[in-house]
Amino acid sequence: MISTDDEQRAFDALIDADARIEPRDWMPDDYRKSLIRQMSQHAHSEIIGMQPEGNWITRAPSLQRKAILMAKVQDEAGHGLYLYSATQTLGITRDEMTEQLIEGRAKYSSIFNYPTPTWADMGAIGWLVDGAAIVNQVPLCRCSYGPYARAMVRICKEESFHQRQGFEILLTLMQGTDAQKQMAQDAVDRWYWPSLMMFGPPDDESPNSARSMAWKIKRFSNDELRQRFVGMLVPQAEVLGVTLPDPNLTWNDETQQYDMSPIDWDEFMEVLKGRGPMNAVRIQTRRDAHEDGAWVREAAAEYARKQQQKEQAA
């Protein structure tokens, strides 16, 4: 019989060799719990993230814009489903995760608790929020847990389309009237700082980051990813003609990275604790959708039961 110590050594050897941990492999309980926390939060974020953009489907300025936005929101639904399925391989059920979300016990990305008052917000979300997601998620394609890593490959490909869509919306607005240019700039001003917060608190204040990196769930720290994101944004902002709302954003030759103003982490914590502008609305909307869709789940379950009966009788 293999002892727990032997299993731990085998697990550590796989991590050290940059190999993949699969669902049937032995894994420490803390590793499993850490993955459930991160992956379920990621799945919840994709599902809740449909709401800010879904609000604009009926108000998009053209049929083409509407079709593209619908496709994007459908992608987000698919991402959530991939991730829920991947998380289920760790021993938690879809119902448990959904219950945690609609009861307000589960966390999701704080960025989706901000309102989207103008069409330009669709551009800012695509460029900034999806851009931050790409920087955060591409390294997850090399995550040590196989189902998560494989799900991320497809998700990242689709996120790159979302980021380009947002960039193109802002570019079109910046080539328009003065009012359209101002609308685009205002949206960038609204979403810039929340998008930087998406990477999580500073490394010295992040309770989970170091352990996730040791297990190779994460490959880079929060601050490293944030710096990488800012370095990507600066030249893109120049192409767009928008100004990033940080007067202290300057290149540092010595550190070879950008110096920036301090982030308002008090705002981040307030939103994370459920006191953001749209927290209550987002959860209530998700709860309503879940309750309204109960008949669909019941019908699907009954159909599956009858099909199973037919197969057994055949």
Spans of features found by a protein language model:
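Conserved alpha-helical segments that form or flank metal/cofactor-binding pockets of metalloenzymes
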Residues: 1-10, 72-100, 167-170
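Extreme N-terminal leader/anchor segments
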Residues: 1-31, 56, 292-314
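Acidic/His metal-coordination segments adjacent to aromatic residues that form catalytic metal sites
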Residues: 20-40, 100-126, 143, 176-180, ...
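Helix-loop segments that flank and shape redox-cofactor active sites
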Residues: 25-31, 49-71, 133-148
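Alpha-helical scaffold segments that form or flank carboxylate-/histidine-based iron centers
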Residues: 31-42, 60-79, 122, 147-159, ...
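Internal, conserved structured core segments that host functional sites
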Residues: 114-165
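Glycine- and acidic-residue-rich phosphate-binding/metal-coordinating active-site segment common to enzymes
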Residues: 143-194
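Extended, helix-rich structural scaffolds rather than catalytic motifs
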Residues: 182-314
